[in-house]
Amino acid sequence: PAFSAFVFKIQANMDPKHHDRIAFLRICSGIFEKGASVLHRQSGKMLRLSQPQQFLATERQTVEKAYPGDIIGIFDTGELGVGDTVCEKKSPVTFIDFPVFPPELFARLSPESSMKRKQFLNGVSQLAQEGAIQIYKQPYIMESFIIGAVGQLQFEVMKYRLEKEYNVTVNVEPISYTCARWTEGDVPPEELIGLDNAMVVYDRRERPVYLLPNAWQAGWLEERNKDVVFLQSPPLGVARLEGN
């Protein structure tokens, strides 16, 4: 069988001195060989996995070959995200996305100093790709992000890591929204009725997300748009094997 694997974890700053990022892959089929060029299904790009490693406590060991069930770590420059698929170009496969818990708390995240904007954007981008917290963008706003979490502790961890790992002090300001809705299929926001009390943001896959003050407002939005299927969490991709 052809090689395939999926990214189940990304960890930034495993070596704090170098701000490295390690993407952990689980091999699903075929044999992985060091230096292999693979297809990244989400971007369509070819990636060369030249420095695969396995980890045992604080020790790292270079991997020459890996087999189904094995876990390897590769250095990532920001191309990969949790749930992404890599495979051989001749036998493309895409695995289903990881399910995401619906956020219940939302806040605006911004740097205290505009002089730290570069570190702020870099830190937010890297931590977002770990999948530990949901980060949303507002159209035309680059000075802040909207973050969504299941519990307050996630906000505190995000703030701590930005300060300690990226040297940027941030403000976390709660906003008065308690639920989010995605839509099934490609439905532009301008086609929806009743967004007066909603905040429209975009997730890491550039899908529109509607933040609402409460469940009643969410229900009212759904009632006004009966031909649209609303989801409480991001829509999952469909696993598929192509070219066979």
Regions picked out by a protein language model, each given a short descriptive name:
Residues 1-244:
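Structural and coupling elements of P-loop NTPases
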